[in-house]
């Protein structure tokens, strides 16, 4: 494509390839570079908040609500609002962030927003104010993840993306259990040990999580270098003025690239289902009356299961291809949704659900991130990942809204969960119709 008002790409494709962190022939393909490790570490930091959001925060929010409050619908609408804000902001900011030096600035701003709001949740708030602060923290998290995902193309090569992305999710799952276990021990043992109330211990867990998040973000902040970019700092103003025209050009380029467009549509639907299952599993279990302790421990098991399974998924992608493994995960998620809707009634079934989700959750997320990175232009990575995020977050709006609305209208949370299967079925059709552009080539996509 031809970008309107686009500054000259810096560096050139040849220079970018020379600067990209390639692996030397002497280095084992099984070893990771320091930059790859420091990129992975951020997943360890932010995943602590993700896990707390899945297991503890919905339960705490439910305790703040009136007795007749419906946490499933309230939580669904909260997730919808957070996703909508990110979906609107990311394509615009993503285009600007492709300017040299801007990506790390936007990343830092959203990261700090997430951390500060995570600490703010520790304040004595009513249920509505608490959910508003949580929405702001979620916006900070998801905004930082958009720029973090796009950093993958600056961190490793096409051939290693599946592996590095999978390791990011894997170590995020296992690493996040450390502060989570500390927080759970504090919540359940703090009242007897320190004489604090359970509420005070829960609030303290928010601060612990924020500190962990900060500690594991510092390595990335101090080491990241933007290899692929479209303008030097002196050309930033011109690039920003052309942002809206560039967004239109990028969208037209995505539409023109049929394999990429087909994948984006499939991604829109299946990541919607995945994110909805993740964000609403605990609130669904709570609504069914499952004990909070059982919910928390079961979700902790998910993290431990997801660690090896994410790494295994990355290895299988090297053998069978990323798209094949993504398709397999979509089929698996359809089975998971049917299980949750028809069979999940007690703690035992929730444990089974947690294990099943752990087997496929990290794999489908990691391979989606790396597969997309292989088929887009590297010098426009943040702009393209902005659209990746708008597809993902807009999808999340639909998924959580669908579950929340269906549950509210029918009064049956199981029917709301079952609606997720429709999204997965549509995604499966588009995946099966898509021609895999990575087959027989390891070259990155280029801008027409």
Regions found by a protein language model. Give the residues of each.
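Juxtamembrane intracellular "pre-TM" segments in multi-pass secondary transporters
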Residues: 23-36, 224-264
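Helix-loop boundary and gating motifs at the non-cytosolic
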Residues: 27-83, 259-298
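Helix-to-loop junctions at the C-terminal end of transmembrane segments
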Residues: 88-102, 308-322, 407
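Structural signature of the two symmetry-related core transmembrane helices
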Residues: 105-120, 324-339
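Hydrophobic core of transmembrane alpha-helices in multi-pass small-molecule transporters
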Residues: 117, 128-144, 349-363
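Intracellular juxtamembrane helix-capping segments at the cytosolic ends
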Residues: 143-157, 363-377
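A membrane-interface helix-boundary motif in multi-pass transporters
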Residues: 187-211, 405-424
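Multi-pass alpha-helical transporter architecture, strongest
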Residues: 212-223, 418-448
């Amino acid at each position: 494509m031809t970008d309107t008002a686009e500054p000259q790409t810096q560096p050139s494709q040849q220079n970018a390839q020379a600067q990209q962190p390639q692996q030397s022939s002497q280095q084992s393909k099984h070893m990771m570079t320091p930059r790859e490790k420091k990129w992975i570490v951020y997943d360890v930091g932010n995943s602590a908040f993700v896990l707390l959001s899945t297991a503890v925060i919905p339960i705490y929010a439910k305790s703040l609500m009136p007795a007749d409050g419906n946490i499933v619908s309230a939580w669904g609408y909260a997730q919808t609002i957070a996703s909508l804000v990110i979906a609107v902001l990311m394509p615009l900011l993503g285009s600007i962030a492709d300017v040299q030096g801007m990506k790390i600035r936007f990343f830092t701003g959203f990261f700090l927003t997430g951390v500060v709001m995570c600490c703010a949740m520790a304040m004595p708030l009513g249920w509505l104010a608490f959910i508003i602060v949580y929405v702001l923290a979620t916006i900070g998290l998801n905004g930082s993840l958009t720029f973090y995902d796009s950093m993958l193309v600056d961190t490793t090569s096409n051939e290693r993306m599946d592996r590095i992305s999978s390791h990011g999710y894997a170590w995020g799952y296992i690493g996040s259990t450390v502060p989570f276990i500390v927080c759970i021990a504090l919540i359940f043992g703090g009242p007897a040990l320190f004489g604090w109330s359970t509420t005070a211990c829960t609030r303290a867990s928010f601060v612990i999580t924020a500190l962990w998040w900060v500690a594991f973000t510092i390595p990335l902040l101090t080491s990241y270098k933007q290899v692929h970019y479209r303008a030097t700092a002196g050309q930033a103003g011109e690039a920003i003025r052309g942002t809206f025209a560039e967004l239109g050009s990028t969208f037209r380029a995505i539409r023109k690239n049929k394999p990429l467009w087909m994948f984006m549509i499939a991604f829109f639907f299946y990541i919607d289902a995945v994110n909805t299952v993740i964000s609403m599993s605990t609130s669904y279990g709570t609504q069914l009356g499952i004990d909070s302790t059982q919910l928390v421990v079961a979700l902790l098991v998910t993290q431990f299961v997801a660690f090896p399974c994410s790494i295994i998924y990355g290895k299988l992608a090297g053998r069978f291809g990323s798209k094949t493994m993504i398709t397999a995960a979509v089929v698996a998620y359809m089975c998971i949704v049917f299980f949750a809707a028809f069979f999940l009634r007690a703690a035992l079934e929730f444990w089974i659900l947690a294990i099943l989700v752990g087997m496929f959750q990290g794999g489908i997320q990691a391979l989606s991130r790396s597969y997309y990175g292989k088929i887009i232009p590297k010098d426009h990575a943040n702009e393209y990942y902005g659209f990746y995020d708008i597809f993902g977050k807009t999808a999340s709006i639909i998924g959580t809204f669908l579950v929340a609305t269906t549950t509210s209208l029918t009064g049956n949370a199981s029917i709301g969960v079952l609606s997720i299967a429709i999204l997965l079925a549509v995604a499966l059709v588009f995946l099966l119709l898509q021609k895999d552009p990575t087959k027989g080539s390891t070259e990155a996509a280029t801008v027409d």
